[in-house]
Amino acid sequence: MDQKGTNENGLIIDIFPDARKSIDVFSNLKSANYLPYVMAAIWAKENRLNDALILNQHDRICDSTIANIFWIKDKKIFTPPLNEGCVAGVMRKKILELATVNSDHLVQEAILTQEILLQADEVFLTNAVTGIRWVKECRDKIYKKTIGSKIFTALDQTI
């Protein structure tokens, strides 16, 4: 971790191609849909990745094996809505709450396709254990780390 609390080297991730997470009333509970996460984590390790992204039944990205995903494009912050099948994570909720009181960090919920991911300026993953983790690379795309660090600082001040 660097002095701002985010990971210094950045994560290397990719999209797990072999399973889709269904969207249903249990989608937001990780324990009810754990098999795609386990398979994706094994695949990530076999491919020397830090994490893998999970696709939903519509081939859109919903989250990673252990975290919610956020992306930044043109200084706007986005995350998939819960109806895309992502886990209702504690840190995701905190960042959305922070966004309601801090206009510098407004977050919009939007679908995340593979194309949108590869056009993003920044990507970060969040969970309650590891906090905010900057994604450095997905496939051949290299991401910046500026706004994500500011969000970590703002979040750290609320704790």
Where are these regions (language model features)?
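Helix-start/capping segments and mature chain N-termini
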Residues: 1-159
